[in-house]
């Protein structure tokens, strides 16, 4: 790996998602008739908030079991990775519930997981000359 290549771990969305839980939350959200913005106006291309929250979170969080090489630190073993992945899935399961829309403890857990992934990615690229600009570009595109 050359000096100028960014070291970006795989994101959770690239590996696995709890799709059944996300789908169930989307179906349930679609059936809500009180207090939901969709009750004001029937928009023809409405997307469930549950799916959007799950996808955004999973695209910002590193997968715990990524295999790395060429200057990266080695990923953790499969059992530990699956345990940490389940913890991230639990956050997703909580994020997609309509009742947790403004639940600050759930949002804090999600923010902490995103911050930990960001710190990990920054630590992997600590010696890269253009690390901040390139990491932001790769993350936000």
Predicted regions span which residues?
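S-adenosyl-L-methionine-dependent nucleic acid methyltransferase catalytic domains
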Residues: 1-141
């Amino acid at each position: 790996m050359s000096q100028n290549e960014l070291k970006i771990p795989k994101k959770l969305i690239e590996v696995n998602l709890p799709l059944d839980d996300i789908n169930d939350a989307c179906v349930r959200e679609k059936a809500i008739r009180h207090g939901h913005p969709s009750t004001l106006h029937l928009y023809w291309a409405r997307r469930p908030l549950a799916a959007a929250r799950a996808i955004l979170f999973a695209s910002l969080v590193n997968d715990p079991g990524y295999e790395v090489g060429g200057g990266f630190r080695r990923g953790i073993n499969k059992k530990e990775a699956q345990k940490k992945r389940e913890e991230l899935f639990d956050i997703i399961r909580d994020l997609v519930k309509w009742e947790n829309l403004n639940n600050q403890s759930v949002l804090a857990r999600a923010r902490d997981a995103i911050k930990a992934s960001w710190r990990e990615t920054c630590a992997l690229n600590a010696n890269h000359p253009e690390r901040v600009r390139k990491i932001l570009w790769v993350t936000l595109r």
